[in-house]
């Protein structure tokens, strides 16, 4: 059907519903219409071309069905934040959940949290999900926007209509440390690009469980070129440490260090064992596959949207929600009777 010939009656007939229902959806009067029906109508409107650009209708509504997702484009990502394994996994899960519930996702990357209120108000969003701004001033941000938002892994005092949706960072580190100790390790090396927020919790958990074993911490450079130089410069020192297991704050750093060691002839897991954190797709595809701490991106996405919906309808949500994590043993670790490093 051509765009200028499509009528509301055509849409209603195709879906087997009344013209009044279609009209109400178009004009945002959906209080008495099920989410499933709203979604069907919106999909049919787009498919037939009745509304070539839904933005005008969405922005005019009280409920735009737009969820903004803002990621901190930190310098460590070197301009490729959307390529990060954790970010990709999170966005994929949010996209699936948003589609299921009839929402539209709008994605923005920025290193400046001050851009967020403008972004949110410009598009009349139903809610926001923020990632990577661990110690930002969320109270100030909240005062600048009427929109409720969910923060992934924030570190801030509780404030109105903001949910801190985090995971068991300390517990994940603890599980990794306990597992390493059970394998018989007594010397470990911990890697992260900072000793703050979630990375600190992960390292603290590892150290607590690994005791009385010795766990040394290296704060590695965030940028790839500098990090590679750091590894090369400290390789001899690493060998002299006789650390038989490495725990990294993320799968990215675990795999990065594993590749470096492999270029130096170090065998994984025969000579050194490695544990990561996040359970990204790359951890399942590496050679050897990476032992890591799994976090459920789908569960977090489902919880995030449920919180936004609840806050929008005036209900109270917990100020902080902590989701569980689970250690996943794979090929980069195993119990060894002897070491040849």
Where does each model-flagged region fall?
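Alpha-helical recognition/docking segments in bacterial nutrient-uptake
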Residues: 1-3, 62, 66-178, 235-241, ...
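N-terminal helix-turn-helix DNA-binding module of bacterial transcription factors
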Residues: 1-64
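Short beta-strand elements in bilobed, periplasmic/extracellular small-molecule ligand-binding domains
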Residues: 95-109, 187-190, 207-230
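Hydrophobic alpha-helical segments within soluble ligand-binding/sensing domains
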Residues: 163-190, 227-236, 254, 293-313
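An alpha-beta-alpha
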Residues: 174-216, 319-333
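Flexible loop/turn connectors
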Residues: 235-341
């Amino acid at each position: 059907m051509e765009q200028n010939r499509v009528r509301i009656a055509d849409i209603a007939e195709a879906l087997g519903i009344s013209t009044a229902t279609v009209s109400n959806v178009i004009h945002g009067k959906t209080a008495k219409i099920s989410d499933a029906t709203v979604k069907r109508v919106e999909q049919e409107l787009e498919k037939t071309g009745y509304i070539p650009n839904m933005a005008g209708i969405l922005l005019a509504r009280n409920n735009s069905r737009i969820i903004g997702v803002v990621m901190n484009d930190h310098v460590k990502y070197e301009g490729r934040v959307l390529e990060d394994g954790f970010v990709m996994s999170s966005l994929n899960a949010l996209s699936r959940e948003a589609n299921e519930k009839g929402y539209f996702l709008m994605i923005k990357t920025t290193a400046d949290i001050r851009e967020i209120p403008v972004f949110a108000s410009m598009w009349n969003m139903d809610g926001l999900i923020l990632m990577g701004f661990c110690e930002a001033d969320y109270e100030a941000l909240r005062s600048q926007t009427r929109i409720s938002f969910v923060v992934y892994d924030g570190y801030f005092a509780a404030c109105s209509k903001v949910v801190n949706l985090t995971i068991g960072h300390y517990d994940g580190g603890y599980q990794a440390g306990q597992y390493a100790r059970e394998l018989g390790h007594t010397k470990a090396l911990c890697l992260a690009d900072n000793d703050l927020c979630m990375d600190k919790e992960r390292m603290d958990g590892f150290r607590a469980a690994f005791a009385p074993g010795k766990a040394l911490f290296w704060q590695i450079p965030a940028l790839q070129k500098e990090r590679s130089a750091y590894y090369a410069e400290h390789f001899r020192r690493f060998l002299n440490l006789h650390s038989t297991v490495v725990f990294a704050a993320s799968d990215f750093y675990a795999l990065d260090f594993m590749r470096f060691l492999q270029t130096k002839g170090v065998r994984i897991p025969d000579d050194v064992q490695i544990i990561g954190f996040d359970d990204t797709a790359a951890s399942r595809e590496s050679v050897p596959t990476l032992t890591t701490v799994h976090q459920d991106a789908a569960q977090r996405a489902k919880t995030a949207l449920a919180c936004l919906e609840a806050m929008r309808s005036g209900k109270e949500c917990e100020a902080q929600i902590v989701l569980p994590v689970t250690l996943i043993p794979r090929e980069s670790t195993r119990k060894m009777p002897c070491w040849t490093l």
